[in-house]
């Protein structure tokens, strides 16, 4: 059972997991682990499933998915019968007023919907993946010069599960720079998998870019793919100014992760998120929600 912290009620909730039995089998049983290494983590598997999710045939999955996970379709721009495929539904846009954004330049917002953890004063060679497992930022982006900027900084991890809104956004106004894709595998990013696969984020397909933020110094954006995520789509234009809350991109079907690195002395993450992260719990957040403040 995966428990996440509800910041509003200040209580823990059990996460509803899409494909829970499959994930537990593939990452916790000997046979499942073998199948994962031979098939499930491969690009071909995710590519083929992604192709299916682009077909009209996949539309039949939408209504049962919405019902099973209580997805509020009133927030969607499209009605449920207007989607052309499951991926069309999965990458749905929300109504303009569905996610209010705090315009205060000193407020840091969540870049998307999901479950968030944050770590302060990070050791670049031992960043927490999950309790007991770490990874290196240099391995994650394959760029020592960029990685060194974030020594003793802050790492914010936003895990999106298949039931979430899957578009991610800029946390401030500023100028985004070129995207750097890195080839990799397609392991699940569910906590069950994170406990099983060392340096999972460094193993998976991922993309990174620098963002010259107006208020939070230089921010490192990283998007990590996962099982069945055939594509990470970047919708922004490099070196073109963006506003706070503008869309950066989206993930096609599957769970996925956005990771942000902040320079030392740039931000302060809300105390409840830091506390829960130390305890080993994620906090449930939505795009636009306040998660921290600028260091003045």
UniProtKB/Swiss-Prot annotation:
Subcellular location(s): the record lists: Cell membrane
Sorted alphabetically, the keyword list is: Cell membrane, Decarboxylase, Lipid biosynthesis, Lipid metabolism, Lyase, Membrane, Phospholipid biosynthesis, Phospholipid metabolism, Pyruvate, Zymogen
UniProt-annotated site: Cleavage (non-hydrolytic), residues: 255-256
Q: Which residues form a coiled coil?
A: none
What's an example GO BP annotation here?
Answer: phosphatidylethanolamine biosynthetic process
Free-text description of this protein's post-translational modifications in UniProt: Is synthesized initially as an inactive proenzyme. Formation of the active enzyme involves a self-maturation process in which the active site pyruvoyl group is generated from an internal serine residue via an autocatalytic post-translational modification. Two non-identical subunits are generated from the proenzyme in this reaction, and the pyruvate is formed at the N-terminus of the alpha chain, which is derived from the carboxyl end of the proenzyme.
- What role does it play? Catalyzes the formation of phosphatidylethanolamine (PtdEtn) from phosphatidylserine (PtdSer).
Instruction: Tell me what this protein is called.
Output: Phosphatidylserine decarboxylase proenzyme
Tell me which species this is from.
Clostridium beijerinckii (strain ATCC 51743 / NCIMB 8052) (Clostridium acetobutylicum)
């Amino acid at each position: 059972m995966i428990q996440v912290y509800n910041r509003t009620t200040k209580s823990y909730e059990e996460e509803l997991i899409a494909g829970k039995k499959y994930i537990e089998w593939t990452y916790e049983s000997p046979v499942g682990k073998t199948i994962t290494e031979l098939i499930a983590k491969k690009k071909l598997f995710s590519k083929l499933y992604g192709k299916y999710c682009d077909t009209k045939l996949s539309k039949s999955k939408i209504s049962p998915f919405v019902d099973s996970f209580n997805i509020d379709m009133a927030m969607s721009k499209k009605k449920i019968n207007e989607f052309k495929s499951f991926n069309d539904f999965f990458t749905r846009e929300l109504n303009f007023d569905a996610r209010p954004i705090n315009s205060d330049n000193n407020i840091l917002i969540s870049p998307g919907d999901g479950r968030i953890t944050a770590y302060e004063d990070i050791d670049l060679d031992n960043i927490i993946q999950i309790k007991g497992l770490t990874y290196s930022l240099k391995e994650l982006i394959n760029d020592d010069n960029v990685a060194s900027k974030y020594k003793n900084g802050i790492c914010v991890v936003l895990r999106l599960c298949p039931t979430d809104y899957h578009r991610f956004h800029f946390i401030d106004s500023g100028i985004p720079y070129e995207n750097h894709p890195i080839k990799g595998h397609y392991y699940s990013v569910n906590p069950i998998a994170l406990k099983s696969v060392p340096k999972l984020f460094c193993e998976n397909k991922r993309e990174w870019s620098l963002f010259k933020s107006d208020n939070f110094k230089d921010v490192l954006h990283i998007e990590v793919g996962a099982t069945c995520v055939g594509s990470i789509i970047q919708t922004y234009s490099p070196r073109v100014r963006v506003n706070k809350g503008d869309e950066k991109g989206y993930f096609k079907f599957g769970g996925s992760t956005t990771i942000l690195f902040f320079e030392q002395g740039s931000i302060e993450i809300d105390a409840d998120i830091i506390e829960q992260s130390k305890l080993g719990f994620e906090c449930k957040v939505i795009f636009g929600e306040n998660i921290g403040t600028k260091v003045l």
